[in-house]
């Protein structure tokens, strides 16, 4: 491991210390909560910063694993139009990532979904078995 990889691993561990990034792939439906900072100017001329969170839910159509510059592309349909947004995986702007549904696909990049609409754009759901515990048996 060279010095750049070591430096990247240190930064990734610092950025993920207070948040958990789940394992997800292309085809999974995720809900990404993003931190948005609004600037407003008050009557007395002072600048006021307000922080809020916004959820963005859609299908992951591409994932790019490149160390600290890793990102993923999420596509959703909003008011009949397809909207895509790329999120940096380790960005401090990304507050949380939740996997809503796991999908079954046979490709790493799902760019073909851009030309599809309706039923042909659906992705089958992959069911993850729940670990059997003593409480589940009782």
From Swiss-Prot:
Ion transport among keywords: no
One term of GO molecular function: structural constituent of ribosome
Organism listed in the record: Rickettsia felis (strain ATCC VR-1525 / URRWXCal2)
Keyword annotations of the record: Ribonucleoprotein, Ribosomal protein
Protein name per the record: Large ribosomal subunit protein bL19
Cited function: This protein is located at the 30S-50S ribosomal subunit interface and may play a role in the structure and function of the aminoacyl-tRNA binding site.
Family: Belongs to the bacterial ribosomal protein bL19 family.
PANTHER family per UniProt: LARGE RIBOSOMAL SUBUNIT PROTEIN BL19M, RIBOSOMAL PROTEIN L19
Pfam families: Ribosomal_L19
Gene coding for it: rplS
GO cellular component: cytosolic large ribosomal subunit
GO BP, sorted A to Z: translation
